Amino acid sequence: MWRGRLPHWRADDVTYYVTFRHRRPLDDFERRSLLRGLLKPDGRQWELLILAVLPERTELMFKVHEAPSTGRPYELSDIVEKAKNRVGKAIIKKSEERWPPFYEESYDRIVRDEAEFEERWQAIFDAPVSEELAEAAEDYDCLWVADAPDAA
């Protein structure tokens, strides 16, 4: 019987694409909180390449770093889930909802080649415009791109 924990393929020195859905549309404050929560492990546990927190889903691409204590890569599910849990608890406290606004499961995929990388990166970058959240992707405050002038 399926109980909600799908297996996730792992490999070293690869780029991952991850997306997860939200139980309900997130408001501006919640989207910014999730963005900050996912940026927190950047540079230590992973190298975040692009991140878009949209009202109904979140999409990101990154490379996982090795844990200094073990020499093995961090578990990507742990990184993403810890950020979701931390932000989810804060949202529950503020909204008095019973459950965090994100589903537990996420979809992840190893990016196989440069063409797939470019396709997925561009789709994430274009998502705020295609969903009519901003006139230009650069204007959407919950889109983060590595090495962009405003990336912090």
Residue ranges and their predicted role:
Residues 1-152:
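Short catalytic/metal-binding and nucleic-acid-binding patches
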